[in-house]
Amino acid sequence: MSTTKSDNYISELRKVIWPIERYENKKFLPMAFMMFCILLNYSTLRSIKDGFVVTDIGAEAISFLKTYIVLPSAVIAMIVYVKLCDILKQENVFYVITSFFLAYFALFAFVLYPNPDLVHPNPEAIESLSLAYPNFKWFIRIVGKWSFASFYTMAELWGTLMLSLLFWQFANQITKTDEAKRFYSMFGLLANLALPVTSLIIGYFLHEKTQIVAEHLKFTPLFVIMIISSLAVILTYRWMNKNVLTDPKLYDPALVKGKKAKAKMSLIESFKMIFTSKYVGYIALLLIAYGISVNLVEGVWKSKLKELHPTKEAYTMYMGQFQAYQGWVAIAFMIIGSNILRKVSWLTAAMITPLMMLITGIAFFAFIFFDSVIAMYLTGILASGPLALAVMIGTIQNVLSKGVKYSLFDATKNMAYIPLDKDLRVKGQAAVEVIGGRFGKSGGAIIQSTFFIIFPALGFVEATPYFASIFFVIVILWIYAVKGLNKEYQVLVNNTEK
C-alpha cells in the first residue's frame, strides 16, 4: 500500500516538475532546443547591438533607429513575409528567412565588422556635416556608422520575425490544445535559461584575459556562435518536418484545419474601437503607458551606462550580465506570478507594475538629479559613486519591468478581456494589439527623437529633466487607467456572476 502511495506521489511530482509525457519528448525537446537557440541569438544580439550603437554613435541614436529605421523595416519585412507565404510552402518560408539572417551574420562577421574604415564614410566628413546641419546630426551620424545601424536593425528584426512570428506560428501549428497547456510554460522556463548562458558566453569571450582572436576582433567568436546557432535552428526545423510531422501520434494535420484566425483590424478601425469603448481604451492606455515609460527610462539609463562603461567590450559585457539578471527574474516571476494573481484582487495585481515603475523611476532620477549631494553623503559609506549607483538602480528598474511584464502585467491585461462579450473581446483585443503595440513600442522613441531634432544642442544628460517629467505624467495616467478599468471590470464581473 505504501509503495503504491509512494509511486503515486513520485508520479504527481514528476508531472509538476516535468509535465511532458515520455512519448512527447520527441516533439517537445527539439522545439525547446529551437527556442533556446533563437533566444540565445536574441539575447546576444540585444547585448551587442546596444554596445555598438551607444559607444560608437551615441545613446540618443537609438530612438532615431527605432523610429525611422526599425519601424519601417519591420513593416517591409511583414510585407515580404506575406508575399513569400503566397508563393512558397510554409516550410520553405522558414528556410528563406532564417537563411537570410544567417547570410547577414556571416557578412557582418567576416566583412563589415573587421573593416570599419573601409565600409564607413570619412569620420571628419560626417562630423563637419553634423556641425553644418545640427537638427539632422543624429541621422548623419547613423549614416556615418551605417553597418552598426544595420546590425541594430537586424537584431530587432530577429526577435520580431524568428521568435514572435516563425517559431510561435510553427508551435501553434503543430501543438494540440492539451499539449499547449503543458508545453508552453515549459518553453518559457527552459528558453529563459538562454539569457544567463548568453551572459557567460559574452563574459568569457570579451574578457580582457581571453585572447582567442586579435584585440580589434574580440566580437568575432560571438558572431560565429550566432551563425552556428542559426544553422542549428534550420537543421532542427528540418528534422522535425521529417520525423515529427510525419508521426501521426505527434501531429495530426486535420487539427490545423478549422482553427479560426484572429480578428485583424486596420489602424482606423482600431482607433474607432478604442475611442468608442471606454473599457477597451483603458486597456490600450495600459499598453501604451508601459511601452513609453520603459523606453524613457531605458534611454537615459543607457546613456549613463556608456559613461560608466565607455568601451564596446565593457558595455556589452554589462549588457550580457543584464540579460542574465533578466532571465533569472523572469523565471522567478513566472513561478510566483500565478500565486500572486490567485491571492490578491485584480486591482492589486494590476497596480504592482505601475507602482514598481514609479518607485524605481523616482530612485533612478533622484540619483541623476542629486548626484553631487548623494556623493557627499555616501562618500566613505559605499565604494560605488553616484554614477554607478544610478546605473545599478536603472538596471534593477529595467530588470523588474521586464520580469513583471511577462507575469503580472500581461496576465492582468488578458484577464480584463474575459468579462467582455465575444464580439467586443475579439475585436477589442485586436484593436489594442494594433494601437497599443505600435504606439507603446515606438512612443518613447518618437518623443525622444523629436525632442533631439527640435533641440539639437541637447543630449540625454541635458534632456533628462524633460524626459523624467514626461515619465511621471505617463505613469500617473497609467495608475488612473488601472483604477478606471478596475471599476468597469468589477461591474462586468458582477453582472456575469448574477
UniProtKB/Swiss-Prot annotation:
Residues 1-33, 89-92, 169-184, 240-279, 342-348, 401-438, 487-498 are cytoplasmic. The chain crosses the membrane at residues 34-54, 68-88, 93-113, 148-168, 185-205, 219-239, 280-300, 321-341, 349-369, 380-400, 439-459, 466-486. It is found in: Cell membrane. Disulfide bonds join 37-85. It comes from the Bacteria. One of its GO terms (molecular function) is ATP:ADP antiporter activity. GO terms for cellular component: plasma membrane. Keywords: ATP-binding, Cell membrane, Disulfide bond, Membrane, Nucleotide-binding, Transmembrane, Transmembrane helix, Transport. The keyword Cell membrane applies. ATP binds at residues 436-442. Residues 55-67, 114-147, 206-218, 301-320, 370-379, 460-465 are extracellular. It is a multi-pass membrane protein. It holds the Pfam family TLC. The keyword Cytoplasm does not apply. SUPFAM superfamilies: MFS general substrate transporter. Belongs to the ADP/ATP translocase tlc family. PANTHER family: ADP,ATP CARRIER PROTEIN 1, PTHR31187. Provides the rickettsial cell with host ATP in exchange for rickettsial ADP. This is an obligate exchange system. This energy acquiring activity is an important component of rickettsial parasitism. This is ADP,ATP carrier protein 1. The lineage of its organism: Bacteria, Pseudomonadati, Pseudomonadota, Alphaproteobacteria, Rickettsiales.
